[in-house]
Design a protein with these regions (language model features):
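Terminal targeting signals and extreme-terminal segments of soluble enzymes
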Residues: 1-74, 80-134
């Protein structure tokens, strides 16, 4: 499943070059992932209460074009891989006209509250976490 979340670039996210600072894209990606999890009815609060966390372990970002103040951006997120302990999201940040600003591959894993890798508890596996095979 793909999910798209929309946001508008705010002034404090722009740097001295008047475009969105590259570090801000990490926040946009996090926003997109959380909106994706809400959309697939993933029980994020429940998994935390059960003593498990989903940690981002690696992000590759490919910057394609600049975004500027008041640009409306769409953050599209989809599950690309899912294993027993970890998974990968593919994310794209684009302007409303389709111009891609950034693409990212985000690897995450499930860990216990002690920080040890763990299988994703079955009760938290939702269909939306499964990659589309189309």
């Amino acid at each position: 499943m793909k999910h798209t979340a929309e946001l508008t670039v705010r002034s404090y996210e722009c740097d001295s070059y008047n475009h969105v600072n590259n570090s801000v894209y990490l926040n946009y990606l996090e926003f997109g992932r959380m909106e994706f999890l809400h959309a697939i009815n993933f029980d994020y609060k429940g998994i935390v209460a059960a003593g498990y966390y989903l940690y981002v372990t690696h992000i590759d970002i490919y910057y394609k074009s600049s975004a500027f103040l008041d640009d409306v951006l769409e953050v599209t997120t989809e599950s690309a891989k899912l294993g027993k302990v970890s998974g990968e999201f593919k994310q794209v940040i684009a302007k409303k006209d389709g111009t891609v600003c950034a693409e990212a591959d985000v690897t995450w894993c499930c860990v216990t509250k002690e920080g040890k890798p763990s299988k994703i508890p079955q009760e938290f596996m939702t269909e939306g976490l499964l990659p589309d095979n189309n």
